[in-house]
């Protein structure tokens, strides 16, 4: 479970929002600082499914007929793939039959009969390779292009390029697997050296969508506002001593924007509002698909 500085109501989420909100209201600032696209764009949103240890490429979209000829034989090549303990297994043929689908003739295995029906709407990139057999650096490389951490992930770059349509929700949302985090943990949705508003914010599919968004107990009327004002005064005094700090300035507004998310999040995460057709499409009412469908 990801926990972003719960002391300031999931600080990363609100820091992301607040920095963008503060900058967007400033006069005469560059377009990139406002979170708006550098160039006109066609895409409105991007969904990236990160499947660590996912299905093999040669069992899905990468048809290699020569594998059947060498099935069960040792690899006869001086170029050795990266492996654990320097052990290379025997060559194995495809376990599913491949067919060319649609007008494009895209090769898709029988493992994906429904995806095969929309073959002409797909773009398959076969030129991407990993430089490590170790899950953690390989996952970093998939998400950032580098095996070492500290670089912005794909979602952060998309957020940086497309901006955000609302100031009530973060532009980059992460829907983690309930069974656990991927190899490398929360670094896989880091903003790296990009501004803080481009860091991924986790939404849970089960239980509260965002941890610590609401107080654990009901507070007396007005006490929440009084707490925010006290915290703001403490932070302003700190700024007067230390000088301008973007991160602190962002956090000073976090409780103010928390109210917006407290109103917006319950509505956008209420799947009971979905139509019967949508529930059927995402398998929300089936035990075997409800968890993934709700994400």
Give residue spans per PLM region.
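Ligand-binding pockets and gating/stacking loops
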Residues: 1-295
């Amino acid at each position: 479970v990801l926990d972003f500085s719960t002391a300031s109501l999931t600080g990363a989420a609100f820091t992301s929002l607040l920095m963008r909100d503060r900058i967007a209201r400033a006069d005469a600032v560059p377009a990139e600082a406002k979170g708006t696209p550098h160039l006109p764009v066609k895409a409105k949103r991007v969904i990236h499914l990160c499947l660590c240890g996912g299905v093999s490429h040669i069992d899905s979209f990468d048809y290699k007929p020569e594998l059947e000829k060498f099935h069960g034989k040792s690899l006869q090549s001086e170029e050795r793939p990266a492996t654990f303990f320097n052990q290379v297994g025997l060559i194995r043929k495809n376990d599913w039959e491949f067919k060319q689908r649609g007008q494009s003739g895209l090769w898709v295995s029988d493992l994906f009969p429904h995806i095969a029906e929309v073959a002409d709407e797909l773009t398959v990139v076969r030129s991407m390779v990993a430089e490590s057999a170790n899950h953690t650096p390989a996952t970093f490389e998939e998400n950032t292009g580098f095996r070492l951490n500290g670089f912005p992930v794909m979602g952060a770059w998309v957020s940086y390029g497309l901006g955000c349509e609302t100031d009530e929700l973060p532009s980059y949302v992460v829907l983690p697997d309930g069974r656990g985090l991927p190899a490398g943990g929360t670094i896989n949705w880091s903003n790296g050296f990009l501004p803080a508003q481009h860091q991924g914010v986790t939404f849970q599919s089960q239980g509260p969508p965002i941890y610590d968004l609401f107080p654990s107990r009901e507070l007396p009327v007005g006490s929440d506002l009084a707490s925010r004002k006290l915290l703001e005064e403490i932070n302003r005094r700190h700024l007067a001593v230390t000088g301008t700090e973007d991160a602190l300035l962002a956090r000073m507004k976090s409780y103010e924007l928390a109210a917006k998310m407290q109103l917006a999040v319950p509505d956008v995460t209420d799947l009971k509002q979905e139509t019967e057709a949508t529930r059927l499409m995402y398998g929300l009412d089936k035990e075997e698909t409800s968890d993934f469908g709700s994400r």
